[in-house]
């Protein structure tokens, strides 16, 4: 039994939600998002909340139940408040800057790395060692942050590279003589 799936998702103030068959649409101040729910899950909009139930008691239906509820909650939060991921850059000479819409990264390569964000994603650089990725779709925001981090992930000896804000890097001891 899914403990997450049992709770209906309340529709926040300022957000209009619509359920059309298996498609949940949310429209809010930040934009509009759609989510197609798996066929094993039944979705209903009743008195200001979206209820999610499994169609049958199969293992597949129960496994999709809680995930579908969380995805719906994420699109409702996204169109109201949006999501953001913060990245930090550590290392001598490692820095980030915006060049038009593109993110320019100096990460110790022989060339600068240029990253063009997908539509709906905003990248800002408050400091040369800090990157903020924001948007309304939680999955896309996390994917963009992961792609930027992948260019130069943090290494365990000195901690140089791109890491998520608040991420702790397990440090290793160097060679001993």
From Swiss-Prot:
GO terms for biological process: cytoplasmic translation. It comes from the Bacteria. The keyword Ribosomal protein applies. Keywords: Ribonucleoprotein, Ribosomal protein, RNA-binding, rRNA-binding. It holds the Pfam family Ribosomal_L6. GO terms for molecular function: rRNA binding; structural constituent of ribosome. Belongs to the universal ribosomal protein uL6 family. This protein binds to the 23S rRNA, and is important in its secondary structure. It is located near the subunit interface in the base of the L7/L12 stalk, and near the tRNA binding site of the peptidyltransferase center. This is Large ribosomal subunit protein uL6. It comes from Chelativorans sp. (strain BNC1). The gene is rplF.
């Amino acid at each position: 039994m899914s403990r997450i799936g049992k709770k209906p998702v309340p529709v926040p103030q300022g957000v209009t939600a619509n359920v059309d068959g298996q498609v949940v649409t949310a429209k809010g101040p930040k934009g509009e998002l759609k989510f197609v729910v798996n066929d094993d899950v039944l979705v209903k909009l009743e008195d200001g909340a979206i209820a999610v139930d499994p169609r049958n008691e199969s293992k597949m239906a129960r496994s999709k139940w809680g995930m579908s509820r969380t995805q719906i909650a994420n699109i409702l939060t996204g169109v109201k408040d949006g999501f953001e991921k913060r990245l930090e850059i550590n290392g001598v000479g490692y820095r980030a800057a915006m060049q038009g819409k593109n993110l320019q990264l100096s990460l110790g390569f022989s060339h600068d790395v240029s990253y063009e964000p997908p539509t709906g994603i905003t990248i800002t650089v408050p400091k040369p060692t800090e990157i903020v990725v924001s948007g309304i779709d939680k999955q896309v925001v996390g994917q963009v942050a992961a792609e930027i981090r992948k260019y130069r992930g943090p290494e365990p000896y000195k901690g140089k590279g791109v890491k998520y804000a608040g991420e702790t890097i397990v440090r290793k001891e160097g060679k001993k003589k």
